[in-house]
Design a protein with these regions (language model features):
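Conserved beta-strand positions
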Residues: 9, 68, 98, 132-133, ...
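Glycine-enriched alpha-helix->loop->beta-strand junction motifs that scaffold or abut catalytic
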Residues: 60-65, 85, 91-95, 124-128, ...
Length: 223
């Protein structure tokens, strides 16, 4: 009832195995292809299996991206174990999604610091589209800087309602960054309706609102 037409649904894979499997996401997507778009997750400890799994999910199940959580693996995104997957994402034409910023669970936050870790990935893989979720707090200014600097680096606002966006993100969203920020809720943690209810407070014009809520995601994920 929140007026959401389509949602990206991500698998979750950590060192102990899948918390939400690619198979489960594929079932959901195949049952409701007009409503849901799949995002894969893989086992970083098995790099070639991970590449094969990503390729299979994109080519056979129509998944539109890869998502990994550096804090869950306790490996920053510039660790060599990610690099075969970045090459595969470029070849497959899908974005790499990750969490930046602090962690909610009691785990180290350092793996989510945008500079130097994510900047190094953007430098090493200029063709890789990167979608950085959870806005990067307490380093949101660093995340905005990277989104300004690199054509293929984007921010998604999952896990934050608009009333909690830092001023530098709101300024970026209203102005030069209107094509670089994607709306997200992080459901079930935050209902989309809660995030959408806060939207008027951002003071976005019609174009910025359309880009934020729809057009940027449609472009980045090839929807």
């Amino acid at each position: 009832g929140a007026g959401v037409q389509r949602a990206l649904v991500s698998a979750w894979w950590g060192p102990e195995g899948p918390l939400l499997s690619n198979d489960h996401v594929a079932e959901l997507v195949h049952a409701h292809p007009d409503r849901f778009v799949g995002i894969a997750s893989v086992d970083l400890k098995r790099p070639m299996d991970a590449v094969r799994e990503l390729r299979r999910r994109v080519t056979e199940d129509g998944f539109r991206g890869l998502r990994l959580l550096p804090w869950l693996w306790e490996l920053p995104p510039d660790d060599r174990r990610y690099y075969p997957l970045y090459a595969a994402c470029v070849e497959l034409g899908v974005p790499f999604c990750l969490q930046v910023g602090h962690t909610g669970p009691l785990m180290p936050s350092e793996f989510g610091r945008p500079i130097p870790h994510l900047e190094r990935v953007a430098l090493d893989f200029p063709e890789l589209t990167i979608v950085a979720g959870h806005i990067g707090a307490p380093w949101t200014a660093e995340m905005v800087f990277l989104a300004r600097k690199f054509a293929n680096v984007y921010i998604d606002t999952s896990a934050y309602r608009p009333s909690r966006y830092p001023a530098e993100l709101v300024e970026f969203l209203r102005g030069r960054g209107r094509k670089k920020v994607l709306f997200g809720s992080n459901w079930p943690m935050l209902p989309p309706s809660t995030c959408l209810g806060d939207l008027p407070a951002l003071g976005l014009d019609d174009e910025a609102t359309r880009l934020f809520l729809h057009d940027n995601a449609a472009r980045v994920f090839g929807l």
